[in-house]
UniProtKB/Swiss-Prot annotation:
This is Type II secretion system core protein G. GO terms for biological process: protein secretion by the type II secretion system. The keyword Aminoacyl-tRNA synthetase does not apply. Residues 1-17 form a propeptide. It comes from Xanthomonas campestris pv. campestris (strain ATCC 33913 / DSM 3586 / NCPPB 528 / LMG 568 / P 25). The modification N-methylmethionine is found at M18. It is found in: Cell inner membrane.
Length: 143
């Protein structure tokens, strides 16, 4: 019978795992990656909301025009699209739901009669809800 000797590997006492510094570096790197990815994702959400606001304003303008076709006049306020205004014959609404009178950021869409160079203006004040601004804070107007 042949005997084989089993040899054991040398002790790994010097390799106890990762040091505290290595763990901190890994956590910092993971945090940096998550910050970068998060900012990209949130930026995409704002871009989507801006595009939705443009589309919503165009749709709301069509509803205002339907109101005008039915009643012979423009609504005095956007709420007239939701509930029939007093003394308004020919109203076949509601033309809009209350939620449609707010932009994707939850701000009330501004409606002005007469408009600046047109019959009416519809304006979303953007992400910050204030006039002016740049990027996603800029105003979105009906053209």
């Amino acid at each position: 019978m042949i005997k084989r000797s089993i040899t054991r590997s040398p002790s790994r006492a010097g390799q106890a795992g990762m040091s505290l510094l290595e763990i901190i570096i890994v956590i910092v790197l993971i945090g940096a990656v998550l910050t970068l990815v998060g900012s990209r994702v949130l930026g995409g959400a704002d871009r989507g909301k801006a595009n939705l606001a443009k589309s919503q304003i165009q749709t709301l303008a069509g509803k205002i025009e339907n109101f005008q076709l039915d009643t012979g006049k423009l609504p005095s306020k956007l709420d007239d699209l939701v509930t029939q205004p007093g003394g308004s014959s020919g109203w076949l609404g509601p033309y809009a739901k209350p939620v449609e009178l707010n932009d994707p950021w939850g701000h009330t869409i501004e409606y002005r009669v007469p408009g600046d160079g047109q019959a009416f203006d519809l304006i979303s004040l953007g992400k910050d809800g204030r006039p002016g601004g740049s990027s996603y804070d800029s105003d979105i107007k009906y053209q």
